């Protein structure tokens, strides 16, 4: 008689229970993990163009650098920030500051003041920039967030007296730098496509805004004093030699993760740009932009 039978006889006599082998469990149906849904893009709010800037805005004649990623905007803002009248902080990303209503009553109250959600956002943007400028003690603020180019109309409408600086660079150099900044995140081909979105946005802004000033990265690094003198003339300020030695100040102007903070920027002086690619080295996807910006004949 087996051990199991003896155990069951004794167990049954004392408890009335028996031990049985559990049946093999059949595998259940395979269920797929639920797909992550990308949240719907929030529609751009309506707003009115101010007809009374003296009342609606605290900021006067702000400066916006419209540039693609990796086009030298951090270098340019460091040079401008060394001017005693120009305050050029790190990227502020004001377009991502949004306003919403906590209740129907708050919406109705703002409607009664003729303030839509877009108008309230403009008031917020203006206050943030004005606060930063006031803290600096300077006269004009310079904002250089690359994604501003995607909403250039809102920025133009928010500050009717704004000045715009368009910073251009060879599209291939932009794509190479964008890829090298994080090669594990994006291939060179992906960097070309992604950077091209910013280039197109800047190109649209350049066509849609009158009276701006264009600076080319290659010319800025080759002859910084000449290009800065021309830019200062456009901005209505005197050229200051200290702009060429922006590194003489402390290092608080560089914030890791906000703009370019690599050694080339931290050197404190303008460094030579990378050699330009030959025409046959330009990827097909970038050739139209190279031609539009005068880098390909």
Task: Tell where the protein language model's regions lie, with residue ranges.
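PAPS-dependent sulfotransferase catalytic domain
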Residues: 94, 101-106, 135-243, 252-265
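PAPS-dependent sulfotransferases, especially Golgi type II membrane carbohydrate sulfotransferases
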Residues: 1-63, 179, 203-207, 233-297
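Secondary-structure transition/capping residues
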Residues: 18-22, 87-90, 166, 185-186, ...
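PAPS-dependent sulfation machinery
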Residues: 48, 54-57, 61, 66-69, ...
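Conserved glycine(s) of the Walker
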Residues: 72
């Amino acid at each position: 008689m087996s051990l199991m039978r003896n155990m069951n006889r004794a167990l049954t006599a004392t408890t009335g229970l028996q031990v049985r082998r559990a049946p093999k469990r059949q595998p259940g149906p395979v269920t797929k993990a639920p797909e992550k849904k990308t949240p719907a893009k929030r529609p751009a709010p309506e707003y009115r163009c101010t007809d009374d800037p003296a009342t609606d805005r605290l900021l006067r004649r702000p400066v916006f650098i419209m540039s693609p990623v990796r086009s030298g905007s951090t270098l340019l803002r460091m040079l401008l920030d060394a001017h005693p009248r120009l305050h050029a902080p790190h990227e502020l990303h004001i377009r991502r500051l949004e306003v919403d209503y906590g209740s129907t009553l708050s919406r109705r109250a703002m409607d009664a003041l003729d303030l839509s959600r877009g108008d309230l956002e403009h008031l917020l943007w203006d206050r943030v920039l004005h606060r930063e400028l006031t803290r600096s003690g300077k006269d004009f603020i310079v904002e250089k967030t690359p994604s501003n180019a995607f909403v250039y109309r809102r920025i133009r409408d928010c500050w009717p007296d704004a000045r715009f600086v368009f910073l251009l660079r060879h599209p291939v150099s932009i794509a190479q730098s964008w890829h090298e900044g994080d090669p594990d995140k994006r291939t060179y081909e992906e960097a070309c496509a992604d950077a091209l979105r910013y280039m197109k946005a800047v190109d649209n802004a350049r066509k849609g805004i009158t009276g701006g000033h264009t600076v080319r990265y290659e010319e800025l690094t080759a002859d910084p004093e000449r290009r800065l003198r021309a830019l200062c003339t456009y901005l209505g300020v005197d050229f200051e030699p200290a702009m060429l030695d922006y590194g003489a100040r402390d290092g608080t102007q560089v914030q890791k993760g906000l703009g370019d903070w690599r050694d080339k920027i931290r050197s404190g002086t303008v460094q030579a740009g990378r050699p330009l690619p030959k025409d046959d080295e330009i990827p097909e996807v970038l050739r139209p932009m190279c031609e539009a910006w005068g880098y390909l004949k």
